[in-house]
Amino acid sequence: SARELALSALHQLRERDAFAQDIIAKTIDKSRLSREDRAFATRLVLGVTSTRGTLEDVIDGCMDSPDDAAPAVRDALALSAYEIIFLQKSPHAAVDQGVELVKTVAPRAGGLANAVLRRVVRAKEHFPFGDPRTDIAAYARLHGFPVWLAERLIAELGPEGARDFMVASNEPAPVFVSVNAVKASEDEVVSVLAAAH
């Protein structure tokens, strides 16, 4: 599944201390999943990676003993928490799928996952834990930024510049196409791209 593939990529990122795009190219892009599932897995990996600090804070606040959870379990919880908090996934579905995902790496941790993810769903009601209009820490959490980085951005760019930077950092990158005029005309490339979409 897309979630299991994303979880595998997150595990490799943690173990190898590699770049997300390199792991995505080696695992997700070469998988036999549908194009939509590969895109979803990629979105999950990039989303969890970019919001990891915020997700870890939320998960830690929802666990009685955060240090006791194995790294693979924390990866699965982070993936599910990302879906709940940042993708606004249906809470019931996110908890059920998150429990199943955790069980793929720790079969006996289903109860823990259920309890933690239900708490994440409840915590989401108060997320980002403050008023983002007046509280920079809440604004940072809302955009998945570590608070220390938000504070540094304010020092460098001012409050408005820091807010603009955080918003822009979460926008999807634009797609550009370069046409090799020796191999195809611009019209041919446009036609091929239109047909592929």
Range-by-range predicted roles:
Residues 1-197:
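Class I Rossmann-like S-adenosyl-L-methionine
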